[in-house]
Amino acid sequence: MGRKKISLIGGGQIGGVLAQLCALRELGDVVMFDIVEGMPQGKMLDIAEASPVDGFDVCLQGTQDYKDIAGSDVVIVTAGLPRKPGMSRDDLIATNSKIMTSVAEGIKQYASNAFVIIISNPLDAMVTLCQKITGMPANRVVGQAGVLDSARFKAFIAWELGVSVKDVSAMTLGGHGDDMVPLVRYAAVNGIPVMELLEQKYGAEKAKEVMEAMVNRTRLAGGEVVALLKTGSAFYSPASSAIAMAESVLKDQKRVLPTCCLLNGEFGVNGYYVGVPAVLGASGVEKILQFKLDATEQAMMDKSVAAVKGLVDSLDSILKG
């Protein structure tokens, strides 16, 4: 049996890190597509020349031709403009919807049997657009947001409590924006509720304030990176997050990862892509895990879904206009 094949659409910062991670983990042969002549070829050659040092054996190819993504097992899309300081993800919708339309047509023609992971912003709208244009089964077209948002939440908790990130369990639901829903009630350190640990450290009132600050920082974490970089947006952490999803599919790991999936009644949502916990395996999204939200969590989820609906509606008006 030959090696798996991963295609990366977009050769920018995230694409470069994705290619390197795929190679280092030997997930499969990698193709990087970008419209900029020479750029993907140069990046892939650079990574390939590190193979004797890093000790990986995979084929790396840069291209300007969608034909080269044929036979892909996984396609990861990062193409589109990144955010700049003062911009929201939603500000990118007009430009990036045009780019995504072209990308989706390429995937439809040459890689319609792949598992597709969208990273491009605004995420919830871009994954919706890609699925509509490709006509691919919804369980094989998803968005990467929740893995990253949850990772940020976990990191802030670990740093606050002075524990290993490996022992923190936490998750966000909803859209990839300022209305995402970090689930405080389920956050734990090796099974111990985070709120209990914060209350031991600070007392009940202060613990609530500290948790609220971490929740808000999680919601605004992407913008925090953008403000510091000044010329672009996060790329290391989004790439690592997408690789976790790709690896679960390529190796049939059946990991439970927060994934932007098309919902059909789950969590009371119909016909919209929203971040929820999903089992990712060889066939794509194999199952969405549902659980009861309390009144506060449900209200936050409803608000987040409303923001997603507004974004998708604005996408529809742009496409019609």
UniProtKB/Swiss-Prot annotation:
Q: Where are the active-site residues found?
A: H176
Name this protein carries in UniProt: Malate dehydrogenase
Keyword set, alphabetical order: NAD, Oxidoreductase, Tricarboxylic acid cycle
Database matches in SUPFAM superfamilies: LDH C-terminal domain-like, NAD(P)-binding Rossmann-fold domains
**Could you give a GO molecular-function term held by this entry?**
L-malate dehydrogenase (NAD+) activity
EC supergroup of this enzyme: oxidoreductase
InterPro entries given for it? L-lactate/malate_DH (IPR001557), Lactate/malate_DH_C (IPR022383), Lactate/malate_DH_N (IPR001236), Lactate_DH/Glyco_Ohase_4_C (IPR015955), Malate_DH_type3 (IPR011275), NAD(P)-bd_dom_sf (IPR036291)
Please explain the role this protein plays, according to its UniProt record: Catalyzes the reversible oxidation of malate to oxaloacetate.
Residues annotated as binding substrate? R83, R89, N121, R152
Its family remark reads:
Belongs to the LDH/MDH superfamily. MDH type 3 family.
